[in-house]
Swiss-Prot record:
Keyword line: Lyase, Metal-binding
Protein family (similarity comment): Belongs to the terpene synthase family.
Name of the gene this protein is made from: TPS10
Catalytic activity: geranylgeranyl diphosphate = beta-araneosene + diphosphate
Stated name of the protein: Terpene synthase 10
Gene Ontology terms: biological process: terpene biosynthetic process
UniProt GO MF annotations: metal ion binding; terpene synthase activity
Length: 356
């Protein structure tokens, strides 16, 4: 697969995606990654000497330290399980390609595992890990915080079911491209940021689940989801071109719309402007949301929730730039051509010691 239209020059992602600098936060400790990997080994998902799998999990889970920077170890461990579950199911469904019957069956079984805590296919490690993850969430919440638990399970199920239609909106036909409005509607949920934010209601007990019903907050969260999905598409664009699976990447399929775009630069400008407009919308809506609450303590809780959204936005961007696995063969954007040398994950050398 090749890029359809030629660009004029390398484009800087750090200059193209704009958000307030004060949203950045130093990542928290990443020691939880080893513990998450150990849990997976104990469940038979990975082998202790499987360096390739550890590298993959290490790369995925290192994002947690950036997107949930205020977490202590037990909270970080929960974010690690959350992200690991997300990648496990996403990768498994991708491996099924276009087997509709198998895909639907898998989604139904995982839905049962999330809602009922039961395993339908006794040979499914995915279902086993889903039940393990669900049980850990319930233990963390307890019955006194069942509303937070139900909130997250509900959002996970909704996100789960978007994986199927999302895989159907692309085609390898040369002139086909999906409706961007349709893509954006599904991707708002599919990118998983709404579920990521729902996890905060479990991790941080000061957050009131009633805030989830506030329409202005949900608007902010939806805007954040689209901004993050555009960032992810930009970062993964070259790798997906190389692997010939960029059909659902906006930076790829919008180039096919010759009625709107004649160059790759125009596509980039359009998407960067949309992402930055959504950041401006968030900045505009935040004081309006805070103004809805007269009590000072209530405002502090709302601000805390907004800060968590900030960290999802900034953490995703910074981690994406730093993550070594996303630098390969990227010839379209600068800032992704080489590693900064910063270590963002755990070390393979620590595993043998950890498993003693």
């Amino acid at each position: 697969m090749e890029a359809i239209k030629q660009k004029r020059s390398l484009i800087s992602l750090k200059e193209s995606f704009i958000y307030p600098h004060e949203w950045n936060h130093e990542p928290c400790d990443n020691k939880f990654i080893l513990e998450c990997f150990k849990e997976s080994v104990n469940l038979g998902i990975f082998q202790i000497d499987d360096k390739k799998s550890f590298s993959y999990i290490n790369s995925c889970l290192s994002s947690c330290a950036y997107m949930w920077p205020l977490c202590n170890h037990s909270q970080s461990l929960m974010t690690g399980r959350f992200i690991q579950w997300s990648f496990l199911i996403d990768d498994y469904l991708d491996s099924l390609e276009i087997d509709d019957k198998k895909t639907d069956s898998t989604v139904l079984n995982v839905e049962k595992a999330l809602i009922n805590g039961t395993i339908t296919n006794k040979n499914s490690k995915l279902e086993e890990y889903t039940v393990f993850f669900r049980n850990k969430l319930f233990e963390y919440c307890g019955r006194e915080r069942l509303d937070a638990f139900n909130l997250l399970i509900n959002e996970l199920v909704i996100c789960l079911w978007t994986l199927v239609p999302f895989s159907k909106i692309h085609s390898k036909e040369k002139d086909f491209y999906p409706s961007y409005q349709l893509y954006r509607c599904i991707r708002t949920i599919n990118v998983g940021i709404i579920a990521c934010c729902a996890l905060n209601f479990i991790l941080f007990k000061d957050l009131d689940v009633k805030l989830w019903l506030n329409p202005r907050f949900r608007k902010i969260l939806n805007r954040a989801s689209i901004q993050i999905s555009i960032v992810n598409d930009a970062v993964s664009y070259a790798k997906e071109i190389l692997n010939e699976n960029a059909y659902c990447n906006t930076f790829y399929f919008l180039q096919k719309d010759s009625t709107k775009f004649s160059t790759f630069d125009q596509v980039c400008e359009y998407l960067f402007n949309e992402a930055n407009t959504y950041i401006k919308d968030i900045i505009t809506d935040e004081p309006l949301l805070l103004h809805e609450f007269e009590d000072v303590e209530d405002r502090k809780v709302v601000q805390s929730l907004l800060n968590h959204v900030h960290y999802l936005i900034s953490g995703n961007f910074v981690w994406s730039i730093e993550n070594n696995q996303r630098y390969q063969s990227n010839i379209y954007f600068i800032n992704l051509l080489q590693s900064t040398g910063k270590s963002i994950g755990s070390s393979w050398s620590n595993i043998k010691t950890f498993f003693r």
